[in-house]
Amino acid sequence: MANVTLYKQDGSENGKVELNDAIWAVEPNENVVFDAVVMQRDSLRQGTHAVKNRSAVSGGGRKPWRQKGTGRARQGSIRSPQWRGGGIVFGPTPRSYAYKLPKKVRRLAIKSVLSQKVLDSDLVVVDGLNFDAPKTKAFATVLDGLKVSDKALVVLEDGNEVAAKAARNLPNVKVVPAEGINVLDVVDYKKLILTQSALQKIEEVLA
């Protein structure tokens, strides 16, 4: 089993913590990670685009002039698509872009990005993040002690609302619960900071 340094909240070392090789030592699969990122981004799309077809645009439904005898081309309605202001043919309609990859593929994708963090030495494990009050300055001090200056994804155990509130005003920090860790966030943020409890929860879910 691989292991990484376990840090205290003040940035000092507190021994080592073992990592489950089935999660943290997987050969990263870039193709699967790409598919997972595209899936998540597609699921975030609003899909509210819409245009009016010939039944929705304003205008009369009667023939603009009689069929024969005028010398002009025959027309059935001023709402036809060839008219200025007429309806759009085969235009976009509201739809959901969400879809799901197979569960095994999604699990391989999250394991791949987590393993990549270990390979890049971008994984930081802290024995706990406990604050008396939700103060942004206090959380910034913790990051300074851990020597984290890059964008950071902080994964907390359930119920740690004080730490989550302390970090939410920091521009380069995002906080998610252990159950909410996902491929897109891990890819978007350089550093991955886990509490020891969050690490255990992730390994329970993915093992």
Curated annotation (Swiss-Prot):
GO cellular component, one term: ribosome
Residue span of region Disordered: 45-78
Lineage: Bacteria, Bacillati, Bacillota, Bacilli, Lactobacillales
Presence of the UniProt keyword Ribosomal protein in the record: yes
One BP annotation, GO: translation
Gene name as annotated: rplD
Subunit and interaction comment: Part of the 50S ribosomal subunit.
Summary of the function given for this chain in its UniProt record: One of the primary rRNA binding proteins, this protein initially binds near the 5'-end of the 23S rRNA. It is important during the early stages of 50S assembly. It makes multiple contacts with different domains of the 23S rRNA in the assembled 50S subunit and ribosome.
UniProt entry keywords in alphabetical sequence: Ribonucleoprotein, Ribosomal protein, RNA-binding, rRNA-binding
Protein family: Belongs to the universal ribosomal protein uL4 family.
InterPro entries to which the protein is assigned, alphabetical: Ribosomal_uL4, Ribosomal_uL4-like, Ribosomal_uL4_dom_sf
Protein name stated in the entry: Large ribosomal subunit protein uL4
Protein species of origin: Lacticaseibacillus paracasei (strain ATCC 334 / BCRC 17002 / CCUG 31169 / CIP 107868 / KCTC 3260 / NRRL B-441)
One Pfam family hit: Ribosomal_L4
Coiled coil: none
Domain of life: Bacteria
Molecular-function GO term, any one: structural constituent of ribosome
